[in-house]
């Protein structure tokens, strides 16, 4: 199943209830290099909380969890350049062979881009390495 590699139930237990109530919460941080939880992160109550990530708009969360849904679009070339700069050539190979195709299949299967009211188009890295 596209997007099936995420533990949505844990998100529903640890994060969603507090988001709905505007309360502080803690969640377990998953370390993909160890394939295990690696501590917790505390999130204070705030007037605005951003939930980001490739799978954060899965239909599992279509029950009014978010006030605004935004899609961050990036060209394949810019995406690969950023992965290479951030993670190195070996990781880029893994991303190209596994993670990018999985994310693309998920986004297409569930119409993620089309379900968003806001589209943010990434710009290529500038001379200073800055990007939007």
PLM segments and residue spans:
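NTP-dependent small-molecule kinase module
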Residues: 63, 68, 72, 77, ...
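Conserved nucleotide-sensing/catalytic segment adjacent to the nucleotide-binding pocket
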Residues: 1-43, 48
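Short, intrinsically disordered, mixed-charge
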Residues: 17, 85-88
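ATP-dependent NMP and nucleoside kinases share a basic, alpha-helical "lid"
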Residues: 36-86
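Short, basic, glycine/proline-bearing loop/turn elements
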Residues: 22-25, 90-95
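Alpha-helical scaffold elements adjacent to nucleotide-binding pockets in ATP/GTP-utilizing enzyme cores
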Residues: 10, 14, 79-82, 98
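A short acidic, glycine-rich active-site loop
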Residues: 1-6, 93-101
